[in-house]
């Protein structure tokens, strides 16, 4: 056992390969068994490879496996194309036999349909593969064949040399780099092989297209010699058209990775178009006696159909008109009845409304009369009350006025008596006293001091009596009698 435990650890920590990589795992196990028998001293002295080396190796292995799967898919698609080409040829042969077994009729109509059929097929195939097929394509196919043979010989040589070379070590860095380079070369050689196989598949497609073109040309020549023009021939030819178009569409979807197959199919369609043209030219040169009879028969049938259509058309036109008139009449009758009922109802409503209005007016008049009577009664009572109040007021006013007059007379009498007394006193004072005019802020007290020498209450009272004063109020410019 070797001491290189790190390689075992790195191996175990990687993901487990799927069933598609069993061959690769067997080769790795063989390499590891051979490495175990080598010297352990050299392995211990050398450095360990980087961790990413095994990842890169795994990626290269996955790429090679993917290329193998793509190559297998391309081979299966080529086989399917070959099988479909065989089925197309069988359908075309069957359609030719069916046209031979049909009875001839309507000679002028079928060539036109066949020309349209072949022209449509040629136009559709030209649209799907617009590039024409020329001698350059043939020259390119020859060159591709030579290049493919060269690549195949180179790849075989490289595989033989690789099988003779000894297998490298996995332990050292230099050996690891050499192994990665060798495996990269292996990948490139496998890619060259895949490309060469693709070129071979393109050549197979071209051969298939040439075969179909030959079959189509033979069919066109055989159809040019025959006179099958029945309606069943049309249906059979339509079915053949649909089958060929479906097959062509399937071939287009499957021939996405093979460029030269479309060109081969275009050549086939060109052959079909040429056959159709030759058939139409041969059919145009034939007599048209039966066609004239069929046209006359069709014209008579057409006139009979027109007469029947006219008769049926008049009946179809009259029936809806009569039905429409009846419906309109019924609607008019029902409408008139509805209008009459509506008018009668409106009249009755008007009469009822007028009666109601008259009753309301009479009620309003009665209520207005009652209200006026009540108002008159209330006004009369109010007037009587007012008159009574006025009479009582007048009486009270008269009594008061009489009392006032008596009071006024008594007051007047008192005033006269007082005036007389005052006059008598003044006369008495004027006969024996003096006069003084009030100036400034003089009062009875000061005037008494001025004239009597003292302002005693007795002196002041004398002045008051002499002048008829009740209080101490005097004004400027007033003349006062001093007794």
From Swiss-Prot:
Basic and acidic residues biased stretches: 1-40, 103-118, 126-160, 180-199, 244-256, 296-311, 358-395
PROSITE patterns noted in UniProt: LYSM
Region annotation (Elastin-binding) ranges: 14-34
Boundaries of every LysM domain copy: 434-482
Membrane-traversing stretches: 317-337
Ranges of biased composition (kind: Polar residues): 64-85, 230-243
UniProt-annotated stretches for the region Disordered: 1-311, 348-437
Cellular component, GO, one term: plasma membrane
Membrane topology designation: Single-pass membrane protein
Keywords, comma-separated and alphabetical: Cell membrane, Membrane, Transmembrane, Transmembrane helix
InterPro entries (UniProt xref): LysM_dom, LysM_dom_sf
UniProt entry tagged with the keyword Membrane: yes
Positions with biased composition (Low complexity): 204-222, 275-294, 400-428
Cited Pfam families: LysM (PF01476)
Intracellular or extracellular location(s): Cell membrane
Function: Promotes binding of soluble elastin peptides and tropoelastin to S.aureus cells although it is not able to promote bacterial adherence to immobilized elastin and, therefore, is not a microbial surface component recognizing adhesive matrix molecule (MSCRAMM).
Entry note about domains: The elastin-binding domain is located between residues 13-33 at the surface-exposed N-terminus, whereas the C-terminus, containing the LysM peptidoglycan-binding domain, is not exposed on the surface of intact cells and presumably remains buried within the peptidoglycan. The presence of the TNSHQD sequence, corresponding to residues 18-23, is essential for EbpS activity but not sufficient, additional flanking amino acids in the amino- or carboxy-terminal are required for elastin recognition.
Protein name, entry field: Elastin-binding protein EbpS
């Amino acid at each position: 056992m070797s001491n290189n435990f790190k390689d075992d650890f790195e191996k175990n920590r990687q993901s487990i390969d799927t069933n598609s990589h069993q061959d690769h795992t067997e080769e790795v196990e063989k390499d590891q068994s051979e490495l175990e028998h080598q010297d352990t001293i050299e392995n211990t002295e050398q450095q360990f490879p980087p961790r990413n080396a095994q990842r890169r190796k795994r990626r290269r292995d996955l790429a090679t496996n993917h290329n193998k799967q793509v190559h297998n898919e391309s081979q299966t698609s080529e086989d399917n194309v070959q099988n479909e080409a065989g089925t197309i040829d069988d359908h075309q042969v069957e359609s030719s036999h069916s046209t031979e077994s049909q009875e001839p009729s309507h000679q002028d109509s079928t060539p036109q349909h066949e020309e349209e059929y072949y022209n449509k097929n040629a136009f559709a195939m030209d649209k799907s593969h617009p590039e024409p097929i020329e001698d350059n394509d043939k020259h390119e196919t020859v060159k591709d064949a030579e290049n493919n043979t060269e690549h195949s010989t180179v790849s075989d040589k490289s595989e033989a040399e690789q099988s003779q070379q000894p297998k490298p070590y996995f332990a050292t860095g230099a050996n690891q780099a050499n192994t990665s380079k060798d495996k990269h070369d292996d990948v490139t050689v496998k890619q060259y092989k895949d490309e060469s196989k693709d070129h071979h598949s393109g050549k197979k497609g071209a051969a298939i297209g040439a075969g179909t073109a030959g079959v189509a040309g033979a069919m066109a020549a055989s159809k040019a010699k025959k006179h099958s023009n029945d309606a069943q021939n049309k249906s059979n030819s339509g079915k053949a058209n649909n089958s060929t178009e479906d097959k062509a569409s399937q071939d287009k979807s499957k021939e996405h990775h093979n460029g030269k197959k479309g060109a081969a199919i275009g050549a086939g369609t060109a052959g079909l178009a040429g056959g159709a043209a030759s058939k139409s030219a041969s059919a145009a040169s034939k007599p048209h006696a039966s066609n004239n009879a069929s046209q006359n028969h069709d014209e008579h049938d057409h006139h009979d159909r027109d007469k029947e259509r006219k008769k049926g058309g008049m009946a179809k036109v009259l029936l809806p008109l009569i039905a429409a008139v009846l419906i309109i009449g019924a609607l008019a009758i029902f409408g008139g009845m509805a209008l009459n009922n509506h008018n009668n109802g409106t009249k009755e409503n008007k009469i009822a409304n007028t009666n109601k209005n008259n009753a309301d007016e009479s009620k309003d008049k009665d209520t207005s009369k009652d209200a006026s009577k009540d108002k008159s009664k209330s006004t009369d009572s109010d007037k009587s009350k007012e008159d009574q109040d006025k009479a009582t007021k007048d009486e009270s006013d008269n009594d008061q006025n009489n009392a006032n007059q008596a009071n006024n007379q008594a007051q007047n009498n008192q005033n006269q008596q007082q005036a007389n007394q005052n006059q008598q006193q003044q006369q008495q004072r004027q006969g024996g006293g003096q006069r003084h005019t009030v100036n400034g802020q003089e009062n009875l007290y000061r005037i008494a001091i001025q004239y009597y020498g003292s302002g005693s209450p007795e002196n002041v009272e004398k002045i008051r009596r002499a002048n008829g004063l009740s209080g101490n109020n005097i004004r400027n410019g007033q003349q006062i009698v001093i007794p």
